[in-house]
UniProtKB/Swiss-Prot annotation:
This is tRNA pseudouridine synthase D. InterPro entries: PsdUridine_synth_cat_dom_sf, PsdUridine_synth_TruD, PsdUridine_synth_TruD_CS, PsdUridine_synth_TruD_insert, TruD_catalytic, TruD_pseudoU_synthase. The lineage of its organism: Bacteria, Pseudomonadati, Campylobacterota, Epsilonproteobacteria, Campylobacterales. Keywords: Isomerase, tRNA processing. GO terms for cellular component: cytosol. It comes from Campylobacter jejuni (strain RM1221). Responsible for synthesis of pseudouridine from uracil-13 in transfer RNAs.
């Protein structure tokens, strides 16, 4: 697999099989709203001021710059649980040293509001959130397409979704991973944060490709016979039987890495029949590789063979990255929707665990790329 020579953007496979659904989506502050959910309650004591902000059409970094210029706090002294996109309306939490609180007493900005403040003992760090609630409004939705949207949402709510990295990771032209590969091969870059981001894009690209291969396997296991699976994947009859008897869409593999969902530790799938029950109960999920020296290793069998198909040509760079694991299969929570036939608006709300992308879910529902 020569990533550098590819001229087209890789398109991961969908898990659902319906045809594309017609709807208009614009990622603006009225039609795309994100609300961050903290990982813990704020204590009410300590040296850090927690700001609950609402930003519109600003990146998190742009919001920090505005607050820095007003308060005098250096950008590096702010804390945040995650970066949020520029487009849309975002409610998120930031932290700053409490001693600068008075400088924000008369703060006013057309695109940035401080809604409330809290006191806490520590600075917010990346990952200090449970997840995000999303509101999405689709427009120009005909009644026939509204029915298709409802069915797609019910299917995703029942089976779960592919936890791909979203387009935000890969840049305007979808090729940030190529720059990450160049850096791993020795290209110099002074901007450390950009360097880390591009290498992360490389890891994310490989993750998406492996997950797409697992989605393909799951479709094949549903659609093909044991004999055909044996021929395609060069597996034993017993392995083919194990795939065929799994009723859920996303098939687990013996020897792959699993994790306690949504925050738990990694472990190997040794007893497939036992783990299937926990997977169906949403207590565990399969974890894909973010390549690196410290990532939990896959066992053996088909799981390792499929992983090697994607990662074998990049193992020489393994030592240059820390690595980790990411859930490949996630679940919608608190799902709601409503259709206004008169306005032709279809509104969707749901909660996702941290690290999951609402745009990935929306692309799965609509079966088309959002911003082409």
């Amino acid at each position: 697999m020569n990533l550098e020579e590819e001229n087209t953007i890789f398109k991961p496979l969908y898990s659902l099989k319906h045809s594309p659904i017609n709807a208009y989506f614009s990622k603006n502050s009225d039609d795309f709203v994100v609300r961050e959910r903290p990982l813990y309650e704020f204590s009410g004591k300590g040296e850090h001021l927690i700001l609950h902000i609402n930003k519109k059409d600003l990146t998190t970094n742009e919001a920090l710059k505005i607050l820095s210029e007003t308060s005098g706090v250096k950008i590096r002294d702010f804390g945040y649980a995650g970066f949020k996109d520029k487009q849309g309306s975002t409610f998120q939490y930031l932290s700053m040293p409490k001693k600068f609180e008075s400088f924000l007493s008369n703060f006013s900005h057309p695109k940035l509001k401080i809604l409330e403040t809290f006191i806490h003992e520590n600075k917010l760090r990346i990952g200090h959130l449970k997840g995000n609630t999303f509101f999405i409004r689709l427009k120009k939705v005909l009644p026939s397409d509204a029915l298709k949207l409802e069915q797609a949402l019910m299917n995703l709510d029942k089976q779960g979704f592919t936890n791909y990295f979203g387009y935000q990771r890969f840049g305007k032209f979808g090729d940030n991973y190529k720059e990450g590969l160049e850096i791993l091969r020795g290209k110099k870059m002074k901007n450390v944060k950009m360097k880390e981001f591009l290498i992360s894009a490389f890891q994310s690209e490989l993750f998406n490709r492996y997950l797409s291969k697992r989605v393909e396997l799951s479709h094949f296991a549903n659609d093909f016979s044991e004999k055909e699976l044996i021929q395609i994947y060069k597996i034993s009859k017993e392995e083919a039987k194990e795939l065929k008897k799994q009723e859920q869409f996303f098939k687990l593999l013996k020897g792959e890495v699993l994790g306690h969902y949504p925050f738990g530790k990694c472990f190997l799938c040794e007893d497939l029949s036992a783990e299937l029950g926990r997977f169906k109960a949403r207590d565990i999920s399969a974890m894909g590789l973010l390549i690196g020296a410290k990532a939990y290793e896959t066992g053996e069998g088909l799981a390792l063979n499929l992983e090697n198909e994607i990662f074998k040509d990049t193992l020489e760079f393994k030592a240059k990255m820390q690595g980790s694991r990411r859930f490949m299969w996630g679940y919608l929570e608190e799902l709601k929707w409503r259709y206004d036939e008169e306005k032709a608006h279809f509104c969707i709300e749901f909660f996702l665990q941290k690290g999951s992308y609402a745009t990935v879910v929306l692309e799965e529902i609509l079966h088309k790329n959002l911003f082409e």
